[in-house]
Amino acid sequence: MENRRQQIVDLVNRDGKISFSELKQFFPEVSDVTLRKDLKYLDSTMQIVRVHGGAK
């Protein structure tokens, strides 16, 4: 879980933003609910900013 969350942060930092559909392509084995929980956690810890349809 922590590895996946760090990968999400790295993707956002590299590209400046990422859409939810792009996250699904990077993590096809992970459910939508889990990815949304990851985004919520990363936003709450101020590692990313959640936006409609993804993160930046």
For each feature predicted by the language model, list its residue ranges.
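HTH-adjacent hinge/linker in prokaryotic transcriptional regulators
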Residues: 2-9, 13-22, 26-29, 39-56
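Residues in the helix-turn-helix
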Residues: 34
